[in-house]
Amino acid sequence: MIKIYNTLTGHLDEFKPLKENEVSMYVCGPTVYNYIHIGNARPAIFFDTVRRYLEYRGYKVNYVQNFTDVDDKMINKANIENVSIKEIAERYIKAYFEDTSKINLKEEGMIRPKATENINEMIEIIQSLVDKGYAYESNGDVYFEVKKYRDGYGELSKQNIEDLESGARIDVNEIKRDALDFALWKASKPNEPSWDSPWGKGRPGWHIECSAMSRKYLGDSFDIHGGGLDLIFPHHENEMAQSKCGCGGTFAKYWMHNGYININGEKMSKSSGSFVLLRDILKYFEGRVIRLFVLGSHYRKPMEFSDTELNQTKSSLERIENTLKRIKELDRENIKGIDDCQELLATKKEMEAKFIEAMNEDFNTAQALGHIFELVKAVNKTLDEANISKKGLEVIDEVYSYLVMIIQDVLGVQLKLEVEVNNISADLIELILELRRNAREEKNWALSDKIRDRLLELGIKIKDGKDKTTWTM
């Protein structure tokens, strides 16, 4: 049974998707006015892992993550550079895919809508809110009237309207009826992109964008809505309010929010100037190391970014890979031990169950990784004893396949498992041996012997068997 910490209820809820064996999930994507930083990469990596795990457990996952390609930050960026907002969006969407390809996000089957491609869907929801009395037009702007949703507003962020009112600043322009009201549609201004609407030319507010895109691709009610902690209020609170009032569904059933990545003890953010771009980190650390670093902490807990932490993660990944390479390097033709590896098999089954148990408990990747390292330790112990039987080798191979599947397919951490001998890859050696076999079949003994002797000079000894040629160091 999978349990999810639901921000809406404030506790762990049993996960029961709306449709049997199918999960609908929407995660707020980036506003594409700059390159993404490591803090932006955290939700991308985590929710990609949620998707992978749910698929591993047999669910079909409909996963939507948007691009916000029109808002104040993008307009400011375009004006500063004296280019179109479309040019800014295209540049940074391209950069987003360049950067995230290194952290192995699963793009297959992914839906990535752009806000500007869904303006009509936004207008439809806004019109519904106006018709139902939850929104009003003022000088070409349209606002959601928060007090009309007094009983529901603040449910997600655990705030009440009275407290929000006391903390709200007084609006100078007096266009809004109340300081708490938020924009659904903004009247056109010079040097800003605009679209036709029943209220005149203008552009959408930020919050309505996600409501429209989640509705278009997942419906009025769906399973999981994800994003960073900083989005709970006002973004997600406003999303939920306008969607419930305008569309009539329950909107998201489970709300998941990841914690911040801090740098020098402060939340990483572009607005504060305290951030490190993902593409800059990728100059020094591989994307798979960054991905494992993110998964090494529970998603709701804050993380501290540092080179020290990344170097430790790199060492941990190398420990896994070195163990798996040891299995690949086994001299399989000379396995003569008596250990059937039943103890290792029992450990594998135990760790397999514990991995699922950890992931079922609110996707605890940190704990799940701990169980993986326990299994890696058990494998090394078995290999160190060097007493494996032929039957034991089958167990070793089963453990190998399981570890590769869990780490690469479920956690999404790519492994480098090519064995190298004196900087020559195992695959290259096999190719050379294939060429030698061809030479022998053609009775080109001189070439066959030359390949054998040259490999020996490199420290690689080959042995011709009846049906197969093997090699060892």
Curated annotation (Swiss-Prot):
Record EC number: 6.1.1.16
Cofactor binding note: Binds 1 zinc ion per subunit.
Main location: cytoplasm
Broad enzyme group: ligase
Cofactor: Zn(2+)
UniProt GO molecular function: ATP binding; cysteine-tRNA ligase activity; zinc ion binding
Gene Ontology CC: cytoplasm; cytosol
Residue window of motif 'KMSKS' region: 267-271
Coiled coil: none
Subunit structure and binding partners: Monomer.
The family this protein is said to belong to: Belongs to the class-I aminoacyl-tRNA synthetase family.
Name of this protein: Cysteine--tRNA ligase
